[in-house]
Amino acid sequence: MAFTSSPSYGSLNAAFWRTIFVVHCISTLVFTTISTPPEDPVKCVSGNTNCTVTNSYGAFPDRSTCRAANVAYPTTEAELISVVAAATKAGRKMRVTTRYSHSITKLACTDGTDGLLISTKFLNHTVRTDATAMTLTVESGVTLRQLIAEAAKVGLALPYAPYWWGLTVGGMMGTGAHGSSLWGKGSAVHDYVTEIRIVSPGSVNDGFAKVRVLRETTTPKEFNAAKVSLGVLGVISQVTLKLQPMFKRSLRYVMRNDSDFGDQAVTFGMKHEFADFIWLPSQGKVVYRMDDRVAVNTSGNGLLDFMPFRSQLSAALAIIRSSEETQERFRDANGKCAGATLITSTLFATSYGLTNNGMIFTGYPVIGSQNRMMSSGSCLDSLHDGLITACPWDSRIKSEFFHQTTFSIPLTQVKSFINDIKSLVKIESKSLCVLELYDGILMRYVTSSPAYLGKETEALDFDLTYYRAKDPLSPRLYEDFIEEIEQIALFKYNALPHWGKNRNLAFDGVIKKYKNVPAFLKVKESYDPMGLFSSEWTDQILGIKGNVTIIKDGCALEGLCVCSEDAHCAPTKGYFCRPGKVYKEARVCTRADDISVIQSLSY
């Protein structure tokens, strides 16, 4: 069944999206360096007391408000030790926060209202650089952008990293953040770490705080626990990374139809070191990233300034968000698909923000140094302009507001999973335009890691971004299709969710998927026997106490539960809990009109 738009609105779709996107692109190009950076995620009523913490999107998956009695901003390791010691002596709960707080999940939250937040905002210095050993030691609040720049100063490069440079070193390690590669040690930043300094609660004899220096050669078990720690072992103070000599990359994007994508996805990562994909399933297309290492003396001064990470006019963002809300209200599938086609084709035509010389794009391949090609995020490093412009998801304005469902499928099962998604598209070709409005499904390669809470095998990471309503009880257009994909991944293929993204249901029983959990929990018990750095959320996802799912009316609409009865959806708005269309074990919130159509198609 195809949902049709209302005549008065739908007839304007193409012209509307062309107009809006022209404004959007102009603002992106013109205002790249004139933006308002994000505010501190911690806000306090008086000084550093009576505080709340949120993420950069302004809402956690359950929309709860996370409170703390105080926030501390240590500027040195000595100050950090003093903060941890005082809190340990008082038996206070603690959690670490970062400069921008990009984790969607509640990893920054402490329990109750009496806890302490420890911000690494000012632990942002380079400690030492050893060009001969090719190592760089930084404090945990250093951003990826700083890390890349510091390494480049001495002719070194981090080989793989996330594409967004606003993450901190500590944050990347806390959640297992990664780029895309099957080569070398893989794409996870933590697998290029050689030493970790971490401050944990201590005994009376320790002065209530203990500093440990962890290395793979001397403390392998503790080291592998700390590499992806969810922040439950203490506060990482410093990290030493093993780098590589600077190199260049040669990159081109190629768009193809997705007829053979299941086979290509399995093998493409071994052909290109930095390969990834942007899949547009409703359009039947895939954008292949052909991205390879070349010699540092190869001609080229290319730059990646990814367009969706640039500053944008707040007024344009508000119009785009309002249009999406209108499309949801009128169930305007045609409008979403028209917008998705325009956005994705324009991004491809503008090479996603690649330029050959930092100014203009003249053609492929784009060749540039690793520090100029691996990550971006220019909306962060700019002057305050009173929110005339901002990062596209800035919660202080009417901006993007979305869910992110991100998981890793074992490479051996990727073809089958892709075919399952294609089967859903065959049932309703417009169903996944809702993903393409947010640039499609980003797919990145990951490898197995010795980190206890790292990836278990070679896999493809699927990143789905899609509309989230401001009203938690508002159902979404085609939400049953997205929910079914989510459940196919998590339950049929046993996918591993990204620790820093996802909705609650992705973490239901997740810890059973990791074979080294007992070893991790043993280190956790040794480092923090009182659980001062743990929270209700970390206890739930680690399987220690409680459950991540929240059962209440409407809980399935925001992924707080998998529906088991109609009340978990929105029955008064015509959405009922029903089996999946391809994966019959799934339970999804389906609109009544769609149920009758699907049933008729099955006969």
Curated annotation (Swiss-Prot):
Report the EC number(s), separated by commas if there are several.
1.1.3.8
Q: Which key words are in the record? A: Ascorbate biosynthesis, FAD, Flavoprotein, Oxidoreductase, Signal
State the needed cofactors, names only.
Answer: FAD
| Signal sequence, renumbered to the chain | 1-35
Q: In which pathway does it act?
A: Cofactor biosynthesis; L-ascorbate biosynthesis
The family database entries (Pfam families) matched by this protein are listed as: ALO, FAD_binding_4, GULLO2-like_3rd
The family database entries (NCBIfam families) matched by this protein are listed as: pln_FAD_oxido (TIGR01677)
- Biological role: May be involved in the biosynthesis of ascorbic acid.
Q: Which Gene3D superfamilies match?
A: 3.30.465.10, 3.30.70.2520, Uridine Diphospho-n-acetylenolpyruvylglucosamine Reductase, domain 2 (3.30.43.10)
Q: Which reaction does it catalyse?
A: L-gulono-1,4-lactone + O2 = L-ascorbate + H2O2 + H(+)
Oxidoreductase: present as a keyword of the record?
yes
What are the annotated disulfide bridges?
A: none
Record-annotated FAD-binding PCMH-type domain positions: 64-246
Q: Which GO terms describe its molecular function?
A: D-arabinono-1,4-lactone oxidase activity; FAD binding; L-gulonolactone oxidase activity
One example of a Gene Ontology biological process annotation: L-ascorbic acid biosynthetic process
Protein name according to UniProt? Probable L-gulonolactone oxidase 6
| Protein family (similarity comment) | Belongs to the oxygen-dependent FAD-linked oxidoreductase family.
Q: Which gene encodes it?
A: GULLO6
Q: GO cellular component annotations, sorted alphabetically?
A: membrane
